[in-house]
Amino acid sequence: MSRIGKKPISLPAGVEVSIKDNAISVKGPKGVLEWALPEGITVVQEGNELVVKRPSDIKQHRAMHGLSRALIANMVQGVSAGFEKKLELVGVGYRAQMQGKKLVISIGFSHPVEVEPPEGIEFEVPAVTRITVKGIDKQLVGNTAAHIRAIRKPEPYKGKGIKYENEVIRRKAGKAGGK
């Protein structure tokens, strides 16, 4: 991970970074994200670039160096451009719709499933079989999308369920006999 840690993070226009004690705060047009730096890792702002530094080459510091650089880069991208995950509903009668801020999914259960968006997450339903999860925190966007997918995972025989837009479902052959 140390090669990733060496790369400086360029700050786009409109993104401000403040480093206090052991915490970094990134503010941009879409919002503010804060994160506590691991012990020993320091961040220095040089013009419109951030440089992440480590105190020594021990394994723990090398690992935290790359991790910190990657997470700070995700914070910068989140507050400037944001993140989104797209999901597809595959199956007859499977549909999604918005009710206020809530997402309501009819996915073959006896009742519709309602999903409340966590703080900082926004749902969009561009079509009845498509869901878009948007937000500035990459981890929260991914976790929310995974939570929605876990409601009905794609099954391997017909591929019915909720899948990521670019996900390829490994299909299985059905039973050979029986006709």
From Swiss-Prot:
Keywords: Ribonucleoprotein, Ribosomal protein, RNA-binding, rRNA-binding. It comes from the Bacteria. One of its GO terms (biological process) is cytoplasmic translation. PANTHER family: 60S/50S RIBOSOMAL PROTEIN L6/L9 (PTHR11655), LARGE RIBOSOMAL SUBUNIT PROTEIN UL6M (PTHR11655:SF14). This protein binds to the 23S rRNA, and is important in its secondary structure. It is located near the subunit interface in the base of the L7/L12 stalk, and near the tRNA binding site of the peptidyltransferase center. NCBIfam families: L6_bact. This is Large ribosomal subunit protein uL6. It comes from Syntrophomonas wolfei subsp. wolfei (strain DSM 2245B / Goettingen).
